[in-house]
């Protein structure tokens, strides 16, 4: 019996990246007191009105097949949300409803690339991106960013990575894992490179509502880049509803029919009651959204203060999102080695930086998904391990 080549391409791209997290979960399930900072799942409650809408919609019979592109009222809500954000009109014909950001990214890639094409991705990158590109059959090409530049990708670095086979640039702003938020000038410079080489831009914007001081900018919000951009997002993070799997792709209306063909092959519609809830999430103002953003910022500041005097750990304040990358290179360990020792010796689960590409080497990623008191305790344990390692090395 033979399996399809896609399974070979995906083998080794998933489970190994999450091994520390999986072990932390296993131990927590056995009753050990593990501080889990290894996954980005908001810990604060979602807006009650969104939950109530999903429940009432189910009771009202909204459990049948939905439209392939999305329910009309849902598409209107998403289009209005994006119009209000940018100031430029977005119509429902420019929107596809998806089962979360991951499904939206997969749909976009399967629509745009094939075997032989190349997809450029700033490194570090979200852990699933390699698998998404591999599933499409295209070649994954990392583009270097530097810690001293706060992991901001440059137009020149992208230009240097382009070949005759390059088809797509996959951006993520704010970035998971780095927290980098691309500025308008950076987006415009990158966009000029993409225009010059006729590249598509897929932009993962799931943390768009979680910037701190730097304003959010999407290439889809820039009129000269809109026609080549597919903006992908969801309410998973902003509204603390990752289990709803409710998201979208926004792009030129001529692309939507192609995206819909791929989406229907995978899902053949979604859950109308979830789509109704998404419409409420975007149509109404919810204090929980701002409360979540402020909580992550306050926790990030707590973490930065915890390592301000450390000679073993370097921490940079993220510009957005719900993660911080800690530089542990002074300990002489890789991020993965440090993460395993931290779990085994101090009961704290974090993600190794190497799970996010070569650019994450010597780093660990901290999720800001626990209250500040617990986060400070975890920081104390991280600092203890790092200082012990440095003392031993000396």
Language model features with spans:
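PLP-dependent class I/II
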Residues: 2-6, 10, 18, 27-36, ...
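N-terminal binding-site loop/beta-alpha segment at the start of enzyme catalytic domains
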Residues: 14
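Glycine-rich loop-to-alpha-helix module at the N-terminal edge of alpha/beta enzyme cores
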Residues: 37, 60-64, 77-85
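Intrinsically disordered, tyrosine-centered linear signaling motifs in cytosolic regions
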Residues: 64-65, 207
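Short, surface-exposed loop/turn segments at secondary-structure junctions
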Residues: 65-66, 290
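Short beta-strand to alpha-helix junction loop
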Residues: 69-70
């Amino acid at each position: 019996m033979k399996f399809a080549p896609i399974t070979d391409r995906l083998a080794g791209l998933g489970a190994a990246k999450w091994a520390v997290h999986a072990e932390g979960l296993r131990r927590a399930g056995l009753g050990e007191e593990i501080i889990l900072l290894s996954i980005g799942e908001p810990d604060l409650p979602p807006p009650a009105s969104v939950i109530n809408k999903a429940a009432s919609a189910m009771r009202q019979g909204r459990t049948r097949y939905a439209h392939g592109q999305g329910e009309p009222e849902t598409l209107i809500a998403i289009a209005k949300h994006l119009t209000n954000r940018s100031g430029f009109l977005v119509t429902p014909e420019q929107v596809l409803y998806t089962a979360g950001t991951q499904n939206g990214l997969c749909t976009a890639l399967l629509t745009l690339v094939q075997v032989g094409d190349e997809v450029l991705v700033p490194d570090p990158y979200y852990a699933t991106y390699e698998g998404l590109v591999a599933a499409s059959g295209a070649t994954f090409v990392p583009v270097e960013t530097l810690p001293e530049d706060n992991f901001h990708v440059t137009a020149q670095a992208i230009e240097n990575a382009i070949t005759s086979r390059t088809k797509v640039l996959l951006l993520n702003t704010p970035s998971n894992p780095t927290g980098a938020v691309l500025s308008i000038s950076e987006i415009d410079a990158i966009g000029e490179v993409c225009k010059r080489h006729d590249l598509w831009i897929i932009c993962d914007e799931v943390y768009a509502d979680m910037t701190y001081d730097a304003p959010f900018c999407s290439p889809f919000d820039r009129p000269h880049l809109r026609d080549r951009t597919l903006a992908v997002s969801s309410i998973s993070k902003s509204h603390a509803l990752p289990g709803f799997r409710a998201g979208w792709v926004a792009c030129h209306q001529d692309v939507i029919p192609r995206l819909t063909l791929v989406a229907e092959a995978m899902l053949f519609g979604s859950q109308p009651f979830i789509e109704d809830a998404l419409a409420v999430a975007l149509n109404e103002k919810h204090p929980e959204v701002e409360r979540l953003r402020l909580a992550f910022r306050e926790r990030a500041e707590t973490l930065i203060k915890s390592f301000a005097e450390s000679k073993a750990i370097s921490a940079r304040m993220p510009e957005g999102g719900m993660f911080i990358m800690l530089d542990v290179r002074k300990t002489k360990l890789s991020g993965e080695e440090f993460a395993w020792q931290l779990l085994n010796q101090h009961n704290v689960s974090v993600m190794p930086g190497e799970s996010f590409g070569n650019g994450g080497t010597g780093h660990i990623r901290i999720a800001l998904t626990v209250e500040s008191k617990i986060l400070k305790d975890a920081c104390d344990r991280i600092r203890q391990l790092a200082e012990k390692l440095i003392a031993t090395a000396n």
